[in-house]
Structure formats: structure tokens, C-alpha cells
Amino acid sequence: MRTIAVYRPGKRFPSVSVTGAGCALLCEHCKGRFLRGMVPAVSPPALLSFAARLEREGGTGLLLSGGCDAQGRVPIGPFLPAIREIKATTRLLVNVHPGLVSPQEGRLLADSGADRIAFDLVLDPVAIATQLHLARSPQDYIDSLDALCRAAPG
């Protein structure tokens, strides 16, 4: 029988926002509320410092996310070297929630050493426009998922 690992946000596996409480979209389901409950780490040094403290205090990992830009992307790029360092210097699991990605961004995420990618696959064009406030299409979500799958090791 296959085992499914579940990581609930909490003290040992907190959610961390690379944008603090900032978000360009303010989607209908969140309007920034979820971001306010996340640990802010708006610079790579802040993320590294938080990760070191989390491990010292018995943490098991973190969800790295944040608010989206106007294109539906979480600005993870500047944090990729920090993710690599966290993976090299701690035992923490890193789950990244990047939003929409290009093929190049998918490869860079895979190269960062992140353990997991959390991806929202939204295929309803009305929901994308009215709930997420994005001028994107279902195909953009499919292309992003494809980019992540192609970049995934193994």
C-alpha cells in the first residue's frame, strides 16, 4: 500500500510568504487574508535566517509561497539560491507554491532542490477572470503544469 505524506501548516511546518502581505491580485477566495497568517520573509537573507531558526526549534519544513504579481506568478526567482542553501545546510523539507511558471522557471525551480511543488490547476476561464482577477487562460495553467512536470527530476 502506498503512503501519502500530508504536511499541515503549523509551528513545525509553517507557511512563509516571500511578499509579506503584498499581492497584486487579491483573489476573491483570499483577498490577502492567507498572506497575513504567513511568516514574512521578503528577502533571501530573511528566509535563510528563518529556516535556520526553524530547524533549531525542531521544525520539519516549510511552504514557500506569497502573493502573486499581475501575471499570476509568485516572485520565487530571487529566493532560489536560498532554497538551495536551505537544502544543503538543513534537514528541512521545502514545498514551493510558485503560481504560473515558464519552462525556464520550472527548470530553475527543479535545480533549486525544492522537495515539492504545490500548484493550483485552474481550468475554468470564468474563475480565472472573475475569481483570480487574471487575464490568463486555462492553457496557461496547463503549460505551467507541463513546464513543472518536464523539469521534475526522475
Tell what function each PLM region has.
Residues 14-16, 25-28, 45, 49-52, ...:
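N-terminal, well-ordered alpha-helical segments
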Residues 4-7, 16, 49, 58, ...:
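Structured catalytic core of nucleotide-sugar glycosyltransferases
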